[in-house]
């Protein structure tokens, strides 16, 4: 009995089922809390990925191991992270381990795809996974209809107003997923999985749903479909591979572009107050491209790279470094503090240095070259490259690969299309390696369980800590939960953010308070925390550093200048308050400021 159960869960098809759930569940899970709105989506993606790794317990896997050469990029990036860690560039060991666990997750998924393709075949896998994406697309379409009805004034039990449309509650992620669902719908139609009227109704529903995302990238996704379809149609004629189907797909992709425009026009004139359309956003921003926020972020990230070209500013440090750079004469004076460069390669350059984007570019070039060399222009290959094109476009404009659900999907798709791998046999008995795999899987289970418990604790104290509404009894439990999260999970940076918000600026344990707040500022640079940091520095007597932090806070939030100039000096010793104001006056090149005792 046990052997049959073990054989089932370690079979390739069962693994594929879990991968299908990884394609579906994270982006159809309507649970979003603070401070990490995507935690549960990322967590369920990691759980499904971990369950799919049970196939590595199979003896058959270890008899003929194939390692994707593309997957080595994740090892290369991990080495850079370790080098930064050893160099003392990373502010948190837990954050470092969390990043390394993401890279290990991607490495294993990439190689899992190679193994599953070897056993199940690309066509069977593509058909199976495309159905999960289409189901996810319809789930989002139904949810958007429900949201629209609620926003129009219809009372729906348990429904609350969300800032955006779509289950994932993030416009660009929503558009990405719906574009992948649309590509999968077209692929399944070409494989005769849908009748004509069901397909066109589905396409109309998906394009309408995409319009509700408001993402300008949707136009790029649709154009990429047409370009891929054109290239495959031309080559399919030469190779006599799915020629009729590709001609049909080309017509559909060309029709989809004007159809998408007509859908937006209809929505604009029927419900203008309930939706912000992609084309509307595109036209409203077309005359201000050079001054856009994204362009400013790219410029500042480039300057950070030039200042730290070899190892970057450190993984996860770009927010803190962009804050410190507000006073730099080499950066544009936009007052921007940001967590990501909104471009994969620029982000890698800024945080990891020049080696990371070079490794990534080489890995991508070799993967594309080998994939193209052995391409037979079938429908499955077109579906695969369409999904990767969507994620690629998104990665050049935002940061989807920093989320476990998109990272997992991307790594698996690269493994699915891998044509270049290293095959070797294990000299010793393969059964000896299975306990090691089991230990790794158990470690993953423990890690995910501890992170779930930690996030529940963090969410519990989120608002009481920010509002400073903790009672004496709650303070004891709050402190206990903080140390539990810090010591037994990888969620320390987020726990520190909650704990830092509850800290009262005073001289009690001041060095410890400063350490916690400074570490928290690497993760979340809010004005309230910066103000508290400056106040603690003033209380400690470090007036020069306090003045510098006050200046950066004012550059970040000019409208709150008066607030920080009034509040922070009150924490300095009474005889030195004017000294602090003189220092900040010198920093700001402002008229002399005077302290007035209330």
Report each predicted region and the residues it spans.
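Short aromatic-rich membrane-water interface segments that cap or initiate transmembrane helices
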Residues: 34-35, 91-101, 160-174, 286-292, ...
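Alpha-helical transmembrane segments of multi-pass inner-membrane proteins
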Residues: 5, 19, 25-28, 46-57, ...
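Transmembrane alpha-helices of multi-pass inner-membrane enzymes
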Residues: 49, 223-229, 379-432
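Transmembrane signal-anchor hairpin modules in multi-pass inner-membrane enzymes, especially those
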Residues: 1-98, 105-111, 115-127, 131, ...
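Hydrophobic alpha-helical membrane-interfacial segments at the cytosolic entry of transmembrane helices
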Residues: 131-139, 241-269
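TM-adjacent membrane-interface loops and short helices in multi-pass inner/ER membrane proteins
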Residues: 170, 295-338, 345, 352-358
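Flexible juxtamembrane loops connecting transmembrane helices in multi-pass membrane enzymes
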Residues: 225, 249, 260-298, 456-469
């Amino acid at each position: 009995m046990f052997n049959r159960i073990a054989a089932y869960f370690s079979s390739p098809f069962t693994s594929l089922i879990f991968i299908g759930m990884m394609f579906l569940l994270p982006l159809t899970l309507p649970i979003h809390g603070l401070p990490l709105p995507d935690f549960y989506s990322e967590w369920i993606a990691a759980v499904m990925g971990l369950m799919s790794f049970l196939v590595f317990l199979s003896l058959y896997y270890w008899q003929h191991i194939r390692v994707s050469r593309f997957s080595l990029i994740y090892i290369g990036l991990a080495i850079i992270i370790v080098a930064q860690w050893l160099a003392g560039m990373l502010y948190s060991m837990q954050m470092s381990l969390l990043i390394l666990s993401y890279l290990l997750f991607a490495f294993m998924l990439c190689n899992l795809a190679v193994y599953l393709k070897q056993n199940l075949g690309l066509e069977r896998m593509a058909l199976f996974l495309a159905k999960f994406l289409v189901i996810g697309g319809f789930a989002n379409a139904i949810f958007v209809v429900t949201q629209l009805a609620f926003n129009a004034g219809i009372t729906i039990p348990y429904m609350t107003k969300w800032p955006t449309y779509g289950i994932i509650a993030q416009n660009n992620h929503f558009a990405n997923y719906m574009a992948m669902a649309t590509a999968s719908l077209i692929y399944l139609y070409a494989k005769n999985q849908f009748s004509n009227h069901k397909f066109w109704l589905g396409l109309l529903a998906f394009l309408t749903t995409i319009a509700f995302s408001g993402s300008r990238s949707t136009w790029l996704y649709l154009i990429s479909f047409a370009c891929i379809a054109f290239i495959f149609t031309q080559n399919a004629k030469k190779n006599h591979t799915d020629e009729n189907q590709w001609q049909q797909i080309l017509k559909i992709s060309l029709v989809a572009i004007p159809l998408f425009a007509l859908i937006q026009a209809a929505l604009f004139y029927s419900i203008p107050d309930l939706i912000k359309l992609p084309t509307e956003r595109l036209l409203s921003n077309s005359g201000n491209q050079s001054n856009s926020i994204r362009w400013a972020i790219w410029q500042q990230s480039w300057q950070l790279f030039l200042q730290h070209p070899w190892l970057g500013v450190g993984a996860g440090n770009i927010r803190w470094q962009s804050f410190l750079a507000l006073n730099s004469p080499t950066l544009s004076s936009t007052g921007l503090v940001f967590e990501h460069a909104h471009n994969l390669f620029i982000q890698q350059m800024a945080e990891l240095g020049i080696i990371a984007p070079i490794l990534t570019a080489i890995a991508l070039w070799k993967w594309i070259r080998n994939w193209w060399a052995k391409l037979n222009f079938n429908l499955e290959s077109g579906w695969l490259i369409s999904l990767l094109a969507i994620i690629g476009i998104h990665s050049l404009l935002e940061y989807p690969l920093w989320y476990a659900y998109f990272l997992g999907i991307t790594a698996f798709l690269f493994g699915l299309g891998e044509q270049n791998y290293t095959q070797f046999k294990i000299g010793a008995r393969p059964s000896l390696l299975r306990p090691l795999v089991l230990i790794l899987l158990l470690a993953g289970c423990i890690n995910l369980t501890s992170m779930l418990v930690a996030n529940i604790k963090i969410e519990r104290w989120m608002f009481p800590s920010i509002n400073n509404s903790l009672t004496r009894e709650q303070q004891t439990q709050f402190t206990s939960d903080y140390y539990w999260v810090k010591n037994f999970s990888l969620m320390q940076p987020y726990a520190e953010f909650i704990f830092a918000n509850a800290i009262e600026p005073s001289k009690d344990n001041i060095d410890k308070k400063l350490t916690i707040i400074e570490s928290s500022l690497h993760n979340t640079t809010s004005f309230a925390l910066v103000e508290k940091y400056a106040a603690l520095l003033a209380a400690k007597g470090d007036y020069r550093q306090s003045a510098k932090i006050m200046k950066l806070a004012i550059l970040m939030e000019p409208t709150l200048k008066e607030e920080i100039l009034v509040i922070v000096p009150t924490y300095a010793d009474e005889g030195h308050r004017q000294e602090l104001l003189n220092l900040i006056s010198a920093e700001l090149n402002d008229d002399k400021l005077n302290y007035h005792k209330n």
